[in-house]
Amino acid sequence: MTTTTLGTEPSAHTIESERWPGVATVPSGFKVRVASPVARALFHKAVARLPLRVQMPNGEFSGGGSPDSPLMVIHRPDDFAARVGDSGLIGFGESYMAGDWEASDLTAVLEVFASRVATLIPDFLQRLRGLYIPKQPRSERNSTQNTRSNISRHYDLSNEMFELFLDDTMTYSSALFEDLSVGATPSWDAFAAAQHRKIDRLLDGAGVGPGSRVLEIGTGWGELAIRAAERGATVRSVTLSVEQQELAAKRISAAGLADRVQVDLLDHRQVQGEYDAVVSVEMIEAVGHQYWGSYFQTIDALLAPGGRAAIQAITMPHDRMLATRNTYTWVHKYIFPGGFLPSVRAIEDVTERMTTLRVRERMSMGDHYAQTLRLLDERFSARTDEASALGFDAVFARMWHFYLCYSEAGFRSGYLDVQQIVLDRRNQR
């Protein structure tokens, strides 16, 4: 988690309206006039029960926390209430991007909310959520027509931007640290080794060795393909990101492995052939719940007899997954269009009903993801000037900081988890 010097929020007039239409303009109109006071009242009622302090512009404090509790400072309470009243949690995130509020420790503030997310809204409003919570646009569902643009909106931002905060392995997923005993805080020096440990465990789970024919669904920037090829495997990796394909190919060539690794710009549903191992790291989150069946059916169809698949998947509790599967969120709007997190139960149910695959082994490592995100946020926050030089403005920097802290808070609170899952066929010994 990264601490912030308070009092440095961007003013609304500095926000480019064409680039950030949902942030530059404060919502108005009849709906907002009705919803804003309701949002204000619900917010203050909720924080009164939370171990949190909220400071208003007049210096008054609310919240149920002590002086040592996480501090949320609201600079523009009317704008904050208007945004939250207009679009709920999307408005909550946009109000941070606009500078309506800030926190001395953003992760800590968001963790307080995340750990109590199911009880923040009164029961009667929870039952009515279908009437006021935005729905995912059909244009963002991950059909074969939409998936490439959804992936591009995140991963094609700029290789140079991702290089600012990723390590030399260019691995953008949870690491697996050697020691996460109570109170341990891994340093950046341990990061690359932790990423390799994660990759190697997946490759071991999939049985990748000399001569293995490996399919990777979701290339990233090529590190897993490189590690597999170094074991003597032949790798085909597919991605829908032009930027990732380009840099991954360069990194693979620089490693002297271009004869062993092929990176194709291709939807995984269009892959043909037979593979001894299928590996996929944090790809299922981008598929969307409507297409989980086809994702696992593709793996099932491509896996050779006796083969195994190993995936890494961010998960959420099953009840929360069911409650939010049709909800359009801040993360959808600004970070991952079309994405949705499965539960472990959903993965088991889909593979049982729609494939011949079974979950053979599973390991939970959510605490490792919290530490991964902490390190990535610290690195990004230290290099925002360089991001600005690449054309990513202060609103983007606040958005990215919010995204990393929001995600870290989810793992710290237990609202999110991440699993390494090994699958094989049910009749396989």
Show which residues each predicted segment covers.
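Feature captures hydrophobic
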Residues: M1-Q195, R201-D204
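A short acidic, Gly/Pro-enriched loop at the edge of an enzyme's catalytic core
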Residues: R269-V279
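Class I SAM-dependent methyltransferase SAM/SAH-binding core
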Residues: E230-R269
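Conserved SAM-binding loop of SAM-dependent methyltransferases across substrates and taxa
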Residues: W221-G232
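Conserved class I S-adenosyl-L-methionine
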Residues: P210-G218
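A short glycine-rich, Lys/Arg-flanked "PGG" loop and its adjoining helix->strand segment in the class I
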Residues: G293-P305
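Substrate-binding/catalytic lobe of Class I Rossmann-like enzymes that use SAM or dcSAM, i.e.
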Residues: T315-R429
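Conserved beta-strand signature within the Rossmann-like core of class I S-adenosyl-L-methionine
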Residues: G306-I314
